[in-house]
């Protein structure tokens, strides 16, 4: 990645979910630095640092999906922590035939915006309260707080994306609702401060990624549909 590309990524506009954090920390930074008391200045400095962290964490860079519409794209940035065949969760109503699940772990330093892996219609949204285990653990898929979306492709096949909260992440944001139609790579949500995103491929579709591979949400090809 070139220096210019790196700067564009770091300086990308923040996601709307950052607004309350930026307003609060920005106001505290200005107030703290304006007051004559040393503790207030320390608080102002700390608030300024948190403001910078929020700008970086909530960055929302533009992505350019491939023109080929027969691809499943990464729903999130991060690195692949597991690729295995499993039976989809009952809440997705995708049957009991094992399909490939690709789990992507997002560290605090990754872009946390979630994107649709393919063009289609959201036909199910199911939220599950749960624990906040380390999202890189395999059991996080079943025990952690999560939000599952089933996406029906134009040809009628189903695939799914599951947003999973992690040890630090305590807030899943999802704009998608049942009946909404999305294009591949289009934004649909965000998970705050470290998380995991699972992609369930349609039956018969093989993954093209391996454990440890770095994902770029909305751009990296995970499978051919």
Swiss-Prot record:
GO CC terms in record: plasma membrane
InterPro entries according to UniProt: PS_Dcarbxylase, PSD-A
Pyruvic acid (Ser) modification, residue list: 195
Cellular localization per UniProt: Cell membrane
Keyword Kinase in annotation: no
Site (Cleavage (non-hydrolytic)): 194-195
Pathway where this protein functions: Phospholipid metabolism; phosphatidylethanolamine biosynthesis; phosphatidylethanolamine from CDP-diacylglycerol: step 2/2
An MF annotation (GO) of this entry: phosphatidylserine decarboxylase activity
The keyword Electron transport appears for this protein: no
Post-translational modification summary for this protein: Is synthesized initially as an inactive proenzyme. Formation of the active enzyme involves a self-maturation process in which the active site pyruvoyl group is generated from an internal serine residue via an autocatalytic post-translational modification. Two non-identical subunits are generated from the proenzyme in this reaction, and the pyruvate is formed at the N-terminus of the alpha chain, which is derived from the carboxyl end of the proenzyme.
Annotated catalytic residues: 195
Mode of membrane association: Peripheral membrane protein
The EC number(s) this enzyme carries: 4.1.1.65
Cofactor note: Binds 1 pyruvoyl group covalently per subunit.
Cofactor: pyruvate
Reactions performed catalytically: a 1,2-diacyl-sn-glycero-3-phospho-L-serine + H(+) = a 1,2-diacyl-sn-glycero-3-phosphoethanolamine + CO2
Source superkingdom: Bacteria
Keyword list, A-Z: Cell membrane, Decarboxylase, Lipid biosynthesis, Lipid metabolism, Lyase, Membrane, Phospholipid biosynthesis, Phospholipid metabolism, Pyruvate, Zymogen
Enzyme class: lyase
Biological processes, Gene Ontology terms: phosphatidylethanolamine biosynthetic process
Protein purpose: Catalyzes the formation of phosphatidylethanolamine (PtdEtn) from phosphatidylserine (PtdSer).
Family: Belongs to the phosphatidylserine decarboxylase family. PSD-A subfamily.
Subunit structure: Heterodimer of a large membrane-associated beta subunit and a small pyruvoyl-containing alpha subunit.
Protein known as: Phosphatidylserine decarboxylase proenzyme
């Amino acid at each position: 990645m070139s220096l210019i590309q790196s700067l564009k990524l770091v300086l990308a506009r923040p996601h709307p979910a950052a607004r309350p954090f930026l307003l609060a920390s920005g106001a505290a930074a200005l107030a703290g630095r304006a007051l004559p008391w040393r503790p207030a200045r320390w608080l102002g400095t700390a608030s300024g640092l948190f403001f910078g962290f929020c700008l970086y964490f909530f960055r929302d860079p533009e992505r350019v999906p491939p023109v080929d519409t027969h691809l499943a794209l990464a729903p999130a940035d991060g690195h692949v922590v597991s690729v295995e065949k499993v039976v989809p969760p009952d809440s997705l109503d995708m049957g009991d035939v094992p399909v490939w699940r690709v789990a992507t772990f997002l560290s605090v330093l990754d872009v946390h915006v979630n994107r649709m892996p393919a063009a289609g219609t959201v036909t199910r949204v199911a939220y599950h309260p749960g624990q906040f285990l380390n999202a890189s653990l395999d059991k996080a898929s079943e025990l952690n707080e999560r939000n599952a979306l089933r996406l029906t492709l134009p040809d009628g096949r189903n695939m799914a994306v599951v947003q999973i909260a992690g040890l630090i992440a305590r807030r899943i944001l999802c704009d998608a609702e049942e009946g909404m139609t999305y294009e591949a790579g289009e934004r649909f949500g965000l998970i705050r401060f470290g998380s995991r995103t699972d992609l369930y491929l349609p039956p018969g579709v093989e993954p093209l990624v391996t454990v440890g591979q770095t994902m770029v949400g909305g751009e990296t090809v995970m499978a051919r549909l």
